[in-house]
Every structure is written in C-alpha cells, then in structure tokens.
Amino acid sequence: MSDHFQLKSHFKPAGDQPTAIAQLCEGLEAGLAHQTLLGATGTGKTFTMANIINDLNRPTIIMAHNKTLAAQLYGEMKEFFPKNAVEYFVSYYDYYQPEAYVVSSDTFIEKDASINEHIEQMRLSATKALLERRDTIIVASVSAIYGLGDPKSYMKMMLLLKVGEKVDQRDMLRRLAEIQYTRNDVDFSRGTYRVRGEVVDIFPAESSTFAIRVEMFDDEIERLSIFDPLTGAIEKHIVRTTIYPKTHYVTPREKILGAIEKIQEELKDRRAQLLSANKLVEEQRVTQRTQYDIEMMRELGYCSGIENYSRYLSGRTPGDPPPTLLDYLPDDALMIIDESHVTVSQIGAMYKGDRSRKENLVEYGFRMPSAMDNRPLRFEEFEAISPQTIYVSATPGDFELDRCVGAIAEQVIRPTGLLDPLIEVRPVGDQVDDLLSEIYKSVEKGERVLVTTLTKRMSEDLTDYLSEHNVKVRYLHSDIDTVERVEIIRDLRAGVFDVLVGINLLREGLDMPEVALVAILDADKEGFLRSARSIIQTVGRAARHLEGRAILYGDRITKSMAKAMDETARRREIQHAYNIEHGIEPHSLAKKILDSMDVGEEAGPKDNLRLIRKESKKVLSAKEITVQIKQLDSKMHAYASDLEFEKAASVRDEIHELQQQLIN
C-alpha cells in the first residue's frame, strides 16, 4: 500500500497531452474550481486524466454517465494504476422497481429489487478505500449523487480489533450483529461469520478474496490472520484490523431510538392533517405502515424501506441534502466528469424524476412527508459539495463552457498522428444500397463499420436487410443490459461480426480502434440525434483508424452538419500541420481487447433475460421447459406491470418458442 499514485504505462505523453496536463495541473494548484479538457476523440483523454491524477497525487472520483462507460474507464484505470486502489461505484441493482402509486388505476406498486452482490461488495470496497487510503481512484456513475449512509454513523459502527486487546467474545459477536453480519457456521460467505470454540472467522462485506480469523485465549485476542476463505490457507498474520459494516445504511442503536421519537412526532402531525382534510383512508394507511416500520426498527434495528426515514437517521433538518458518496471524499479530492456534455445534464435530471414519484406516495398516505428527503442531490447541491472539477469532453456543453471561460485545455493532436475522419455527404435516395456497397468494401479490408439510424424500426429493418445480404451484423438497442452491451462491443472488435447498427448508443466514450467507417443515415433530419454535437461524437468513433471516414446521408446540408464538418476540417488542418512539422507518420491505434467488464460478470443476475434466452436455445426436457415457462410467465407479467411492454413482448415470444418445443 502506498500514499502515492504509481502510473504504469509504456507510453509517454505526446502531441497535445503534455500541454493539456501542465495547464490543468497549474489550474488545480492555483485553486481553479472548474476547468475543461476539450479533447478530440482518440487524442488520449483517459491517459491525460491518468497523468493529472498521478502528478497531483490526490484522491479522485471519475464520474461517467452510464455503467458501460464506467466499466471501460475502470478497466483502463486499473491498467494504469495496478498498485493503487482503483474502485468501482455504480448502482448495485440488476433490477429495480421503486415503490409507486398509480392514481388513475388506484394501484400501489411495492418496491422490488434484485441486488448484484458483486457490485455491492465493490461499493463497500470503494468507501473503505476512501476512508483508509490517499491513493484512491473511484470510477462512479450518477449513482454517486443518490443517498448513502451517513459517513459519521458508518465510521462509528466500525469494529476495531487489535492483538492483545481484552474483549469478551459475546460482546464481539453482538457488535458483529449490530453491523448486520449474520452467523453461519455452514455457508461461510461475504457478510457472515462463524464460531469454532475460541476462533471466530469473519468474511468482510467489502471483500471477495480474503477473510479474517480472530483467535482468542480467554478474553484476549491472541492472533489475527488473513486467510483464503476457499482453501483456508493463512496468507499472513496482522496486528490490527477493521471490520466495516455490511451495509452503508447501518445506524447506531441510540440514533435509531432517537429517530423513532421524531418519526412518531411527525406521524402525529400527519394524521391530524389528513383527518382535518377528511382523508380517512390515507390516514389509516400512513398510520398502519409507519407503525409497522417503527416496530421493525425497534426490534431489529432496520426495516424494509428504512431509507425513507434517512432524514431522522442522519440527523438532518427538512430540505437538507442527503449524505452521498461525495461526503466520503476528503476536502482536497479531485473530481473528473467524463463525457460531461451528457453527464452534467443527467445529474441535473435525477432529482426531478424522483420527486414526482414521491409526491404521489406522500399525498395518498403511503409515505410521510419526510420521505421526500430520501432523494438524489439537486444540481445546485451537487455543485456546492463538489471538489475541484475537470470536465472532459470532445464536445463540451454550454454549462461547461460558461463555467470554464479561460480555463479550457484543448487536446486536438493524437499521439498516433491520426487525423479526424474525412466526412462525405451523399444523397438519401439510395442510402441503403450505397451503404451496403461501402460495407462490402470495408469488410474486404478487415475493417469494422458503425451505422446509426433515427428510429428503432429502421435499425431493425436495416439489420434484417444487411443480414439477408450475407453481412455479419448486430443491432445494439436499449433493451440490452450493461454486461451484454460490453460483450457486443468486444465481439465487434474481435471480428465476430463486422457491422454494428444502433440509434444513439454509438456515441460517447465507446473505444473501438477497429472501426474505419461510420455511416449516419438521414443526417439532414435536424434534432437531438442529429445535432452538431451528436454528429461530431458519432463521427469520432472512426477517429482511431488510419482509414477512418464518415458518410453522412442527406439531401441538404443542415446547420448542424455544416458546424460538425467545419469543426472537423479545422481539427484536420491543425493535426496535418503538426504531423508535417514533427515528421509524424500517422498509424492506427493498437489496443488490446480486454474484458473491462469483469466487474459485472462474476455475479450476473440469474434471472437475467439474456441468460434465460441462451438457456431456451438448448435442448431441454419437458420438465425443464415447463419450469422455464413458469419463470418467464412471471417475468412477463412483472415487465407489463412496470409498463415495460417491449420487454414483456420479447419474453412472450420466448414463451411461445418454448411452448412450441413442448408440443414437438
């Protein structure tokens, strides 16, 4: 373990990178709160980020706008910093249905969730690293702005063990129960402990590879060891250790009792309000639900939906921001917001969506008004609590440009000498046939192709058409989960197929050096998917290939197209001049095809639709088919009740296939 970052790379900063690194580091040292790294696609923005982290030597959080990009960044940062703590913090839900009330049909939907235990372990590992180490990098999604347990309560509940310390074994086991560890002498797994005479084995909640053995003699800790929970082999003896709570939401007993008093006071006031408004059903509902929760908290220390009482458990006043991952960051931390033109707006949107759902729950007596404070941060709260920030994007948004006037580091030169892709405009009339001929040419040269369309229907039809013409093609759509999306991108790079079709899923941050051609169909249809920013991002997917080019199909050149083409031409001019001046011969980027998403593979959801589909393709017995049909039937109804009708229809088709197998 080191207090200093140790960057490992075969490359040195090149092109614009040294200038950008120096400018941003100087700005941070000078105390600038906001800076922007405007880096063209393929210029090595991630490597620049890694060098800034290494030179600055401060704990860092990198925020991405989705799990796919976060997984890619996590994999790259782990490569750059193998000896430091690189952690991953995203939502641990494989499936999440928040509680909601549909007024029109008088339907209450209970909270339902499937938690990915591997991701939960990585979240706990992330906060542990922040509390214990300076050399920590957290790669996070917008999950970082959602309520998390209060860090003060969390730290207060930690169990410290030292060799030679006097401790009663029963007291130690009681403390383990308080931090929600469960005793299991048979199945020793994460978040459990087992007792064998005077030996207590503890499997830390934040660990996947090691456990702690506490050996006692009478009432004294005689030895502490780290061992492999699978083989039982002792790895090393230690002098002290800290056992962290099993969940971030653990709360000391006295705080729970104090919170119960305040909850009862609020319940009394709320009942009076509802009765005075003659809302008898709502009054009965909120009384029954809240009193049940109070009894659970009093007896067990927690209840289902305890996060709805987080205002009282963390000692906040009404309207105060909830504690989040950002509260675990030290004061001198650094924040990097990747693909900021998307991530910033996403952070701002989280609060509004959450609030509208909660208002119904409160109004109709399913929750008390204090539940409104269990929420993500508002954007202004996020800004207030954020440390010094660097926004990273090839196309920064207006927000970043306004905040960073005079503090923008431009990175246009690629270390590989590659120029921005050539852009060509062709008519829409025969776009599909023209595209097919271009695909044939590219595939013959061993290149990959990305095609982006405007609608899901067109993507599906185009995929079918290309497939009928012997093109190895896949369609990337919104129903595909995070893990499978990464697999599809990896398969494209590996040459399992040659063409990937999508709508707006092919833009930010996807790193595919094998892609030489990007085709944008109906590029002259102005709108969000065909804005200048979107076109620049999409065209940028071909910027890592020597033969990189883009075809925009349109019967006219819109303002957005013109702006994107002008910016690309400007960059090409700068890049070409630099290459001539320094005698650089452009070459394609060679990058290993890594499985950066091993963060999600280990504990993928067993009921994942993708896995069920794979299973359904196998030859199954009649009994197995019947069991699968039952599983899929319940899943179909669940999707339908969540108004996810496309997924429900997809599951229905799977059921029909299985029923056909059963008949045959």
Curated annotation (Swiss-Prot):
Keyword field: ATP-binding, Cytoplasm, DNA damage, DNA excision, DNA repair, Excision nuclease, Nucleotide-binding, SOS response
InterPro entries linked to this entry: Helicase/UvrB_N (IPR006935), Helicase_ATP-bd (IPR014001), Helicase_C-like (IPR001650), P-loop_NTPase (IPR027417), UVR_dom (IPR001943), UVR_dom_sf (IPR036876), UvrB (IPR004807), UvrB_inter (IPR041471)
Any Pfam family hit: UVR
Family as reported in the entry's similarity comment: Belongs to the UvrB family.
Protein name from the UniProt record: UvrABC system protein B
Keyword Cytoplasm: yes
Naturally occurring in which organism (per UniProt): Pseudoalteromonas translucida (strain TAC 125)
Residue ranges constituting the Helicase ATP-binding domain according to the UniProt record: 26-414
Subcellular localization: Cytoplasm
Recorded GO MF terms: ATP binding; ATP hydrolysis activity; DNA binding; excinuclease ABC activity
Short sequence motif named Beta-hairpin, residue ranges: 92-115
